[in-house]
């Protein structure tokens, strides 16, 4: 009973400290999301899960002295960097937006004091327009980034570069495929052509030979039938000539013409 009574205050103390720890974590996150000076604070989005504080400090300290660097862990994917001078923050936004930091291409913007989402968060609800909010692109008040003229120019340049890169890739792939086709045609051995020619020639010769043999046999039989018909018709013609009537006058064997004997007169 005494041991159980002693363990209860320890459990209560641990629960209290854990709740205080999580409360401070949430307070810190809320401070970084909502509090602080928005002119010196920079939002870094699209970070990887393994982003380190030292890498961010090296990348952003190039533009000026830093106050603090805070990286979100639950959920991960974004961070906040606070400068001492607002001009250094603007230079960092212009220089590091779209660069590769911690193994991923990050998005760097000036903090406006409104909550942002990472890749793992749900999109926040829209709030009404505030004239004190600043643009992420030019840093001026009165409009947002999607209405900024710089953002439209950058988007047009990106679309043009993408279209140029796509057209170049298509041209390169087409030229490469054509060169491959030429290589395959030139690299094809001549033996295959000779073999195909031989095969086609042999097939044509076989066909012509078979046709000539059949034709010769046909013509031979036809010529034989014609010769037989001619040989049979020739003796008939000779017989018809022999049977034709002889001339009326026939000479005697002595050569004198044969005359019919007149009847002798009886004295």
UniProtKB/Swiss-Prot annotation:
The record ties this protein, via CDD domains, to: RRM_SRSF7
Lineage, top-rank taxon, reads: Eukaryota
Q: Where is the RRM domain?
A: 40-113
Instruction: Cite the record's Basic residues compositional bias ranges.
Output: 152-209, 223-251
The record ties this protein, via InterPro entries, to: Nucleotide-bd_a/b_plait_sf (IPR012677), RBD_domain_sf (IPR035979), RRM_dom (IPR000504), SRSF7_RRM (IPR034651), Znf_CCHC (IPR001878), Znf_CCHC_sf (IPR036875)
SUPFAM superfamilies xrefs: Retrovirus zinc finger-like domains, RNA-binding domain, RBD
Q: Which parts are the sequence repeats?
A: 182-189, 190-197, 198-205, 206-213, 240-247, 248-255
Q: How is it modified after translation?
A: Extensively phosphorylated on serine residues in the RS domain.
Kindly state a single biological-process term from the GO annotations of this entry.
mRNA transport
Glycyl lysine isopeptide (Lys-Gly) (interchain with G-Cter in SUMO2): where is this cross-link?
53
Localized where? Nucleus; Cytoplasm
Q: Where is this region: Disordered?
A: 152-267
Q: Which UniProt keywords apply?
A: Acetylation, Cytoplasm, Isopeptide bond, Metal-binding, mRNA processing, mRNA splicing, mRNA transport, Nucleus, Phosphoprotein, Repeat, Repressor, RNA-binding, Transport, Ubl conjugation, Zinc, Zinc-finger
Q: Which residues carry this modification: Phosphoserine?
A: 61, 192, 194, 196, 210, 212, 221, 223, 225, 260, 262
Q: Which stretches does the record call CCHC-type zinc fingers?
A: 133-150
Region of interest (6 X 8 AA repeats of R-R-S-R-S-X-S-X), ranges: 182-255
What's a single GO MF annotation on this record?
A: RNA binding
Gene Ontology CC annotations of this record = cytoplasm; nucleoplasm
On this chain, the residues bearing N6-acetyllysine are 53
Quote the PANTHER family the UniProt record gives.
Answer: RIBONUCLEOPROTEIN RB97D, SPLICING FACTOR, ARGININE_SERINE-RICH 1-RELATED
What assembly does the database describe for this protein? Found in large molecular weight complexes containing CCNL1 and the p110 isoforms of either CDC2L1 or CDC2L2. Interacts with CCNL2 and CPSF6. Interacts with NXF1. Interacts with YTHDC1.
Q: Which family does it belong to?
A: Belongs to the splicing factor SR family.
Q: What does this protein do?
A: Required for pre-mRNA splicing. Represses the splicing of MAPT/Tau exon 10. May function as export adapter involved in mRNA nuclear export such as of histone H2A. Binds mRNA which is thought to be transferred to the NXF1-NXT1 heterodimer for export (TAP/NXF1 pathway); enhances NXF1-NXT1 RNA-binding activity. RNA-binding is semi-sequence specific.
Protein name per UniProt: Serine/arginine-rich splicing factor 7
Q: Which organism is it from?
A: Mus musculus
Name of the gene encoding the protein in the UniProt record: Srsf7
């Amino acid at each position: 009973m005494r041991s159980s009574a002693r363990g209860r205050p320890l459990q209560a103390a641990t629960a209290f400290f854990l709740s205080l720890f999580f409360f401070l974590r949430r307070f810190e996150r809320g401070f970084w999301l909502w509090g602080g000076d928005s002119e010196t604070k920079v939002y870094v989005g699209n970070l990887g899960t393994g982003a380190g504080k030292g890498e961010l400090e090296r990348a952003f300290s190039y533009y000026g002295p830093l106050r603090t660097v805070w990286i979100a862990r639950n959920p991960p994917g974004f961070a906040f960097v606070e400068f001492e001078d607002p001009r250094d923050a603007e230079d960092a936004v212009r220089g590091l937006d779209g660069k590769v930091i911690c193994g991923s291409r990050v998005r760097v913007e000036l903090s406006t004091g409104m909550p942002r989402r990472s890749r793992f968060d749900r999109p926040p609800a829209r709030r009404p327009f505030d004239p004190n909010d600043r643009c992420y692109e030019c840093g001026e008040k009165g409009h947002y980034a999607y209405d900024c003229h710089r953002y439209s120019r950058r988007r047009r340049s990106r679309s043009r570069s993408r279209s140029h890169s796509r057209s170049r890739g298509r041209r390169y792939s087409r030229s490469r495929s054509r060169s491959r086709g030429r290589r395959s045609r030139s690299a094809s051995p001549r033996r295959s052509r000779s073999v195909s020619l031989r095969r086609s020639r042999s097939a044509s010769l076989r066909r012509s030979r078979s046709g000539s043999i059949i034709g010769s046999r046909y013509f031979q039989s036809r010529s034989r039938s014609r010769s037989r018909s001619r040989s049979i018709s020739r003796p008939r013609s000779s017989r018809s000539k022999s049977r034709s009537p002889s001339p009326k006058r026939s000479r005697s064997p002595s050569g004198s013409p044969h005359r019919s004997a007149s009847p002798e007169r009886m004295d």
